[in-house]
Amino acid sequence: MNSASVPQGMDLANRRAWQTADAVHRFRQEGWTDPGEAAAVSLVAPEARGAPILDIGVGAGRTVPLLTAISQDYTAVDYTPALVALCRQRHPTRRILHMDARDLSAFADAAFGLVVFSYNGIDAVGYDDRMTVLREVNRVLRPGGLFVVSTHNRTGPGFGERPLSWFRFTPNPLRMGWRVLNAVRSLPDVVHYLHNRRLHYDGPGYSVRTAAAHHFGIVIVYATMQEQERELAETGFQCEAVFSNDDGRRLAEGEDLSGTWWFHFVARKTASPAAGA
C-alpha cells in the first residue's frame, strides 16, 4: 500500500476498534492516565482557570471531572458515536458533541482559552490530517491560548510492538503448555497485526505502526519529540514544556527518551499558521 492510502486505512481500522465493546469498556477508566498528564494539566491550570475549555477525544468522559475542576465553561467532542452516547449518559449536564477534530467549524475563531487532546488521540489520524487538527486547534484558540496534547514516542519502548514477541521455547512441558495456550488466545492479535501491517509507513521524524492496544486493532503515529515540536511550531504554537508519561518529569532536549512511552506537550498559540501551511 502506498503512503497516500495510509490515512484512509488508519481511519477505518481505528474507527472500527473504538466501537468495540472492549474499547468502550477501557474508556470507562477514571483519573489521570499517568503522572505526565497530571503534570501537564497542573502546569496550565492556574492560567486556564475559568476560561472556556475544549476537550477533544473525550471518549467515555474520563477527563470531564479533571477539566471541569479548572473551569465550568466546558465543551467536549469525540468522533465515535458510541463513546459520545456513553459520555452523555455519564455526564448528562455537560456539553458533549459528536465532532471530528479535523473539522471544528462549529466553533468560532478564538473561542477557547485551553484545548486538551488527551490519551494520544491525535495519533489516530495520518500525518496530513494531524496537521489539519493542529491548524484547527490553533484557529479555535484565543491568542496566547494553551494547548495540551499527547503523542506516542517513536524512540520509546512501545514502538514496533508485535504479537507473540514474548513467546519462547522451554523444555519444561507445563510452562510450554501454558505458553502455547496463551499463543492460541492471542490469535486475534496476530490476525489484526497482519491485516494492519500493510499500513505501516515511515516519514521524516515519525512512523505509522500497529499498536498493541485493543488487541493490535489500532494503527497510530509515533513521533520523535523534535518532530512534534516542529509540527507545533509550523502550525503557530510555541512549545513551553514536555513531560514524560512514565514518571511525570519535565523533559529536556538531548536526554535519554528510551523509557518514555509517550509525551505530553504544553504549547501556546503565538501566531496563526499561513493558509495551506
Where in the sequence are the language-model features?
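Conserved class I S-adenosyl-L-methionine
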Residues: 1-59, 66, 260
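A short glycine-rich, Lys/Arg-flanked "PGG" loop and its adjoining helix->strand segment in the class I
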Residues: 131-143
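Class I SAM-dependent methyltransferase SAM/SAH-binding core
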Residues: 60-103
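A short acidic, Gly/Pro-enriched loop at the edge of an enzyme's catalytic core
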Residues: 102-115
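Core SAM-dependent methyltransferase catalytic element
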Residues: 252-277
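A short SAM/SAH-binding and catalytic strip from SAM-dependent methyltransferases
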Residues: 114-128
